[in-house]
């Protein structure tokens, strides 16, 4: 696909998918962003999905490519188009996650139109686009998508402070807000943090004790994941494709960043679902400081089994020594499961955005709380693994 558009200062603008020969130009693009003071806006040099090369069957519809805008000399904007499927009322629909769109226009205004042209071309290529994250309405990317007519819905955020005192003292959210910082400090030194930790732990362990399920680590997704997806899919108005082939592309076997937990009934060994978790030791993170953060990344099963899946993820991460566990789930059943497991609601900056050509989040469609999306969808895990 090669589309030529009028570019900047009279130069022709070509919008196309990146090729192997574009690597040096992409390195220069990233270097210019760093030199312009936007070193956090770095485009990946490896656009394919983690398990794509090894685990993607020929012609399988889940894969990721980079689309670029160049002016004949250099790349001026780039984004990842993560090709995927979503099942809406049981019907499979192709779509793309629009991940990491970045433009040289953020450091040089003469290239400010690059991202607009790139996004318009991406929408022409695949009208049904979605993206996750973005941030608050004050963020430039948020305002940009709204101007393009994208619809959005906030995905609730939940956290479980495994080590409450350390979390109170370590979260940047508290440190950067004087009143909350004082409250956190008082809570830590007064013993209130330990008391809260005891209550949360008791609540969670009681739920775990009453659970009829048990979990075990799996090295890969297999036929059992296909059966879970087929069995549970009718209970969701909309759900991202989550069969074994897809999951092994996204969370590949052998990748130490992800842990796959298969959850089954005790004794009967009947599958009830699965959950993927991840953990990372942060270092001067803008949200988590130096805390070790565990994430409930993804999961699937019948909606009635969501509490067992969330509890399994929390149990595993707590045993691995994380300080705090976080999750974002839009579906109401999964949000309830987080609260039931003892997780606390917090301020969320994690949104589901849908392009004008997509069928979700329309006024005449089903409620957003019937859409199952999680932190592991799109590029939402990039900062947490």
What are these regions (language model features)?
Residues 1-21, 192-223:
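Conserved N-terminal entry element of GNAT/NAT acetyltransferase domains
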Residues 2-7, 46, 65, 129-201, ...:
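Active-site/acyl-donor-binding loops of N-acyltransferases
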Residues 38, 105-109:
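Short, polar/flexible loop-turn hinges at active-site or ligand-entry regions and domain interfaces
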């Amino acid at each position: 696909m090669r589309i030529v558009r009028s570019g900047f200062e009279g130069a022709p603008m070509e919008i196309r998918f990146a090729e192997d020969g574009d690597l040096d130009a992409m390195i220069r693009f990233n270097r210019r962003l760093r030199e312009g003071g936007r070193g956090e806006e770095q485009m990946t040099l490896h656009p394919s999905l983690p398990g794509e090369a090894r685990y993607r069957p020929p012609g399988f519809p889940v894969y990721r490519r980079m689309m670029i805008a160049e002016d004949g000399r250099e790349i001026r904007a780039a984004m990842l188009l993560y090709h995927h499927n979503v099942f809406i009322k049981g019907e499979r629909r192709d779509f793309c996650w629009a991940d990491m769109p970045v433009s040289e226009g953020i450091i040089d205004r003469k290239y400010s139109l690059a991202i607009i042209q790139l996004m318009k071309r991406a929408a022409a290529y695949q009208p049904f686009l979605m993206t996750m994250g973005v941030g608050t309405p004050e963020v430039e990317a948020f305002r940009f998508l709204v101007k393009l007519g994208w619809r959005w819905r906030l995905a609730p955020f939940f956290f479980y402070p495994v080590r409450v005192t350390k979390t109170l003292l370590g979260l940047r959210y508290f440190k950067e807000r004087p009143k909350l910082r004082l409250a956190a400090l008082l809570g830590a030194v007064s013993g209130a943090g330990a008391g809260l930790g005891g209550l949360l732990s008791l609540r969670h362990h009681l739920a775990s004790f009453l659970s009829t399920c048990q979990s075990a680590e799996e090295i890969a997704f297999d036929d059992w994941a296909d059966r879970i997806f087929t069995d549970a899919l009718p209970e969701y108005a909309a759900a991202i494709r989550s069969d074994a082939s897809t999951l092994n592309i996204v969370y590949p076997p052998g990748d130490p960043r992800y842990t796959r937990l298969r959850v089954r009934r005790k004794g009967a060994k009947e599958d009830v679902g699965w959950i993927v978790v991840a953990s990372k030791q942060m270092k001067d993170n803008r949200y988590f400081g130096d805390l070790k953060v565990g994430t409930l990344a993804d999961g699937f099963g019948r909606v009635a089994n969501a509490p067992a899946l969330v509890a399994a993820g929390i149990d595993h991460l707590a045993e691995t020594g994380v300080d705090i566990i976080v999750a974002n789930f839009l579906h109401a059943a999964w949000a309830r499961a987080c609260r039931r497991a003892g997780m606390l609601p917090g301020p969320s900056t994690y949104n589901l955005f849908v392009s004008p050509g997509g069928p979700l989040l329309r006024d005449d469609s089903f409620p957003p709380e019937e859409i199952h999306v999680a932190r592991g969808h799109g590029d939402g895990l990039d900062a947490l693994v």
